[in-house]
Amino acid sequence: MSNYITTKWDIVIAGGGPAGFFAAIRCAELNPDLRVLILEKSTQTLGKVLISGGGRCNVTHACFDPAQLITYYPRGGMALRGAFTRFQPLDTVKWFETHGVKLKTEADNRMFPITDSAKTIADILNFEAKNAGVKVHIGATLQKVEKSPRGGFRLEVRKGGEVLPLQTKKLLVATGSDPKTREIVKSLGHSIEEPVPSLFTFNVKDKRIDGLAGVAVENVTLKMDALTQSGPMLITHWGLSGPAVLRLSAWGARILADKKYRSSLTVNWLGDYKLDATLEILQRNKDWHENARKKISVQPAFSQIPIRLWKQLTQFIGEKNWGDISKAEMRKLAEELTAGQFEILGKGQFKEEFVTCGGVNLDEVDFKTMQSRVVEDLYFAGEVLDIDGITGGFNFQSSWTTGWLAGSGLANG
């Protein structure tokens, strides 16, 4: 077992995820003479790929303009702008198609393999790595890294019960949010933005949404502090989820972490409707003679609000008919619809895409090659960097892009 680990390697890649594999394949294809090794601490490579997108793998997003693409990244967008001019979603699509995997675009522009199976993506990455001569070792954890006086790095790797030595000319760190590796990177002189969760759901306990799990509203506007996000929202057993919530959690990741995941939340159930416009519509419903004797609770004034939700938002009115609603009640209802006040009591996990914000300070990385500006021959790719996107394939895209650039840098540098 220890024979391979004491061998001198040209390239060692810590992390067997999407960025690590993409870098390894790119590097080995550009320079087949290089000895490339991937170290993966778990018992399976590409685990995140396999569980993402509900097992379908949201490979990327059909956004092919780098200037627009960077707007989907709460952190790291500006650093990625130049990187996306060299490898962007269109290049990702072409890469997978060239290697035998076709992608499809869904209505919301998320892109998946036509097989609807994440295993398709994991299998092609494993196959291409093996085909390019990349060696992969699982259950191998990077324990220590030292810069060698003669160039390159001396590593200590734990595999099984042993800690074994390894030497490499270049090292790529692609270990995501792994805390042990963060400490190693710090020991080499890099600064780290401490990671906190991003892309999570909100725990909310409120009688207005009790028993409504599964009810979706097509377009709401959410406000928290100075942040605003709009889009679909889903009521769950534990609170609120859906694209609008996930985007707000991403942009507000640090704010919510500082608040211990407790905050006030304003919900406009009508999207961009203002109070005055809402009052006018409610008044028309009151004045319309056919409505006068209909109960407010069963006759929604807005088609975009599901009837079950409408009933609970109007509970304070009781069983009144539209013709009997008072001006005060009408104003209170308008305020409830356009600026409902809720309390976030904690965070839930978005199982399809676990993401953190934070990581290696981007000013310390050359985004043309992904090489460290602090330590020669040290490279970074993927979520170990202080980059995170909203849900929709953007986090995988930053992994493909930084992995591809790192692979090019490792092969040519």
Listing of model-derived features with the role each one plays in the protein:
Residues L80-Q88, A107-F127, H137, A174-G176, ...:
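Short beta-strand to alpha-helix junction loop
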Residues L50-K119:
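A conserved beta-strand/loop capping segment in the N-terminal third of enzymes
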Residues V12-A14, L39, L142, P165-D178, ...:
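Short hydrophobic core segments
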Residues E29, Q44, D65-Q68, T85, ...:
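Residue-level recognition of phosphate/Mg2+-coordinating polar/acidic sites
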Residues K170, A174-L188, I387-G413:
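A conserved FAD-binding loop/helix module that cradles the flavin
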Residues V12, A28-G54:
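Glycine-rich FAD pyrophosphate-binding loop
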Residues Y4-A19:
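Beta1/beta-strand and adjacent pyrophosphate-binding region of the FAD-binding site
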Residues I138-G152:
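A conserved short coil-to-beta-strand element within the FAD-binding core of flavoproteins
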